[in-house]
Amino acid sequence: MAVYALGDIQGCWRELKALMKKLNFKDSDELWLAGDLVNRGPDSLKVLRKLRDMDQQARIVLGNHDLHFLAIVFGGHSAGAKDTLAELLGACDVEDLAHWLRRQKLLYRGHGYLMTHAGLPGCWSCLLYTSDAADE
């Protein structure tokens, strides 16, 4: 089993697919994704659908773009002029995808490593880090 860690996919399905092919990604491998799965690239919908299907292999933490998407879906934010979320927001399964995405963590710990999107807030204690990471 191999573990691959990537960050900031940002809706770039074609590039993610090509990279996984180049890595010869297998069913027994793990894909660690350090947030920002959506927005900026053209295929946020494909990225989320594929990663949801890979739920047993993918270890995901949320990034600011993912949180922005969730805030749009569940209220509180509007899509901005630079957002590339129109296809995703108009998808018939957008709510299912959003509910799946919001179950992902802000940090993940495994194999002796801790993964976050952009560091750890100073107000979090080590106990909280450990507690949240163990919340698998």
Give the predicted meaning of each segment.
Residues 132-136:
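A short, hydrophobic C-terminal helix/tail in secreted or cell-surface proteins
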